[in-house]
Amino acid sequence: MPDYAKKNLSEVEDSAVKHGFSETQIARFAGGDLGCERIGLALEGVKPGRRQAFGHRHEEDEEVYVILQGEGRMRLGEDLIEVGPLDAIRVAPGIMRAFEAGPDGLELLAFGTHHEGDGEIDPGFWED
């Protein structure tokens, strides 16, 4: 295997479909397709006017999110911030987070360190 890998993110399986969240979001986790061992990469999307179906956090992993298209909000613990194109947001381990899209939807890249099994999901994290 060469010392590099290339994959078009549109060709990566959408895990949101597989897990029943396709009504609200898109989640294409590319780390496995790229053969990543210590980092993770995902193309994520939130459909117009929708919110991710759950919040999540990591105990060890640090993540950076880069907004590619659209505007919306991101909840980080108890904080709520506005996000838009080319905003980069670093999230330290332990912080619960989720995105909400504006009327045009939201597309973003998520990347960071990766430790297998290091993730907690909270479906009730961001309720009205």
Predicted features and spans:
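Double-stranded beta-helix
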Residues: 98-128
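Short histidine-centered beta-strand/loop micro-motifs
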Residues: 31-33, 52-58, 100-101, 124
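Short acidic-glycine-tyrosine-enriched beta hairpin
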Residues: 78-93
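A generic "binding-loop/recognition-motif" signal
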Residues: 60, 79, 95, 104-105
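A short, N-terminal "cap"/entry segment at the start of jelly-roll beta-barrel domains
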Residues: 1-39, 119-128
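Conserved short histidine dyad/triad with adjacent acidic residue
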Residues: 23-29, 42-58
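Short beta-strand His + acidic residue motifs that chelate non-heme Fe in jelly-roll/DSBH
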Residues: 54, 74-75, 91, 97-103
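Short, conserved beta-strand element in jelly-roll/cupin
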Residues: 43-46, 57-75
